[in-house]
């Protein structure tokens, strides 16, 4: 046990810090892209609705591993897209990290868009009709009336998406991002006799990340719920 902790201890917090960074950056990007996709999905412009619907349906039915591998092998290795300076001594690690974030954003934004659309469905259509009768355009109605109420109604689905994103960050290990699951894999390889102990350590680590998130978002949803 002491040997396990001597090998694992110094790397455990840095690995989970990478997991947290992946989650935060991906969540911010997913909210931005997901909001854009939602606006397109409910837009009066047919071509925008079609593009958004096609994107969401395609991504939601594509395995996340394929999306991450596409970003690494397709965008970087085949098309030469780099998201870090080649002169940097940490180029490969930084580039893989940012490609993973890009993949998580592309994937998770589809689920964010669906969560927001479920929130929009709770907003009474009469509010939009009243706003149109006052001369407001779609962008003003969406920004000022529909979207704020949709977010309040969609906190629980958005929270579930965020928790799923936190757990999905383990997929980043397939392109060599040094997050928690990659450390777990290497630790198991070196300490196969401590398999269940290693699993327990990392399970507790992810519970520490996700349980407070779920409880906090649940409280926020109760606080912001529309009183009827």
From Swiss-Prot:
Residues 16-217 form the ABC transmembrane type-1 domain. One of its GO terms (molecular function) is transmembrane transporter activity. It comes from the Bacteria. One of its GO terms (biological process) is amino acid transport. It is found in: Cell membrane. CDD domains: TM_PBP2 (cd06261). The chain crosses the membrane at residues 16-36, 64-84, 100-120, 195-215. GO terms for cellular component: ATP-binding cassette (ABC) transporter complex. Keywords: Amino-acid transport, Cell membrane, Membrane, Transmembrane, Transmembrane helix, Transport. InterPro entries: AA_ABC_transptr_permease_3TM, ArtM/GltK/GlnP/TcyL/YhdX-like, MetI-like, MetI-like_sf. It holds the Pfam family BPD_transp_1. It is a multi-pass membrane protein. Belongs to the binding-protein-dependent transport system permease family. HisMQ subfamily. The complex is composed of two ATP-binding proteins (GluA), two transmembrane proteins (GluC and GluD) and a solute-binding protein (GluB). Part of the ABC transporter complex GluABCD involved in glutamate uptake. Probably responsible for the translocation of the substrate across the membrane. This is Glutamate transport system permease protein GluC. It comes from Corynebacterium efficiens (strain DSM 44549 / YS-314 / AJ 12310 / JCM 11189 / NBRC 100395). The lineage of its organism: Bacteria, Bacillati, Actinomycetota, Actinomycetes, Mycobacteriales.
């Amino acid at each position: 046990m002491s040997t396990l902790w001597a090998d694992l201890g110094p790397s455990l917090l840095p690995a989970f810090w990478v997991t947290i960074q992946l989650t935060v950056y991906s969540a911010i990007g997913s909210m931005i892209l997901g909001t854009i996709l939602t606006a397109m999905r409910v837009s009066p412009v047919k071509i925008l609705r079609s593009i958004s619907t096609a994107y969401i349906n395609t991504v939601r039915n594509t395995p996340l591993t394929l999306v991450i591998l596409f970003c690494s092998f397709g965008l970087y290795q085949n098309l030469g897209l780099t998201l870090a300076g080649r002169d940097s001594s940490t180029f490969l690690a930084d580039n893989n990290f940012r490609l993973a974030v890009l993949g998580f954003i592309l994937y998770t934004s589809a689920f964010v868009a669906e969560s927001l659309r479920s929130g929009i469905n709770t907003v009474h259509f009469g509010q939009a009709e009243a706003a149109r009768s006052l001369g407001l355009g779609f962008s003003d109605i969406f920004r000022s009336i529909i979207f704020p109420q949709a977010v309040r109604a969609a906190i629980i689905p958005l929270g579930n998406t965020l928790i799923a994103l936190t757990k999905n960050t383990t997929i980043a290990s397939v392109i060599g991002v040094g997050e928690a699951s990659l450390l777990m894999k290497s630790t198991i390889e070196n300490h196969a006799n401590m398999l269940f102990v290693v699993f327990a350590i990392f399970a507790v680590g992810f519970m520490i990340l996700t349980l407070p998130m779920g409880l906090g978002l649940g409280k926020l949803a109760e606080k912001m719920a529309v009183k009827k």
